[in-house]
Regions:
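Mid-domain Rossmann-like dinucleotide-binding core that forms the NAD(H)/NADP(H) cofactor-binding site
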Residues: 35-113
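Glycine-rich phosphate/adenylate-binding loop and adjacent beta-alpha elements
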Residues: 1-25, 38
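Hydrophobic alpha-helical segments typical of transmembrane helices
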Residues: 11-12, 22, 44, 75, ...
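Glycine-rich cofactor phosphate-binding loops and adjacent beta1-alpha1 units
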Residues: 56-57, 87, 97, 101-102, ...
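Glycine/charged-rich beta-loop-alpha catalytic/anionic-binding loops adjacent to active sites
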Residues: 22-33, 60
């Protein structure tokens, strides 16, 4: 349990007593296990995007790798809500399409050779760099993705 008014840093317990104002009703379409995981993905995404990247500002170019996973999807939603230009990578065209429906500006398939050049072509004129990469996928993102970063900008894993 964590991220509440009285336990902001988090604690681990089998039972906990909370004020009713600290609770939210789980969405009816989620199982108990799915609902329990939602704060974990959200908090991880929040820390990666807002705390570590330092780029939660309108117009910033954000690359979210491995789109389709819970944390990556939450970062996409947070960044889009901040009016960032969100770009995604995935090995699945279906996941890229879904990410665009959720607010991504564009996406690349990391299985394709030269994906980083394709991404560079998608970036807005006058801002041909990525301000931050939030990576949950690994692979060649470190090698290829960091070339897209403006010098001294954050890479959050």
């Amino acid at each position: 349990m964590g991220g509440t008014k009285y336990n902001p840093a988090g604690t681990l317990a089998e039972t906990v007593v909370l004020d009713a104002g600290e609770l939210e009703e789980a969405p009816v379409h989620l199982s108990d296990a799915e609902a329990a995981a939602l704060p974990l993905t959200g908090l991880t995404a929040w820390r990666a995007f807002f705390t570590k990247s330092g780029n939660a500002k309108p117009g910033r170019n954000i690359l979210v790798t491995g789109i389709g996973g819970g944390v990556a999807l939450m970062v996409l939603l947070f960044a889009a809500a901040q009016e960032c230009n969100v770009f995604v990578s995935s090995g699945s065209e279906e996941k890229i399409t879904r990410a665009k429906e959720l607010g991504a500006v564009g996406g690349v398939n990391y299985k394709e050779e030269g994906w980083e050049k394709k991404l560079l072509g998608m970036l807005p004129e006058g801002r041909k760099w990525v301000d931050a990469i939030v990576d949950g996928a690994g692979g060649d993102v470190v090698q290829k993705g960091t070339r897209l970063l403006k010098v001294s900008l954050p890479f959050s894993c």
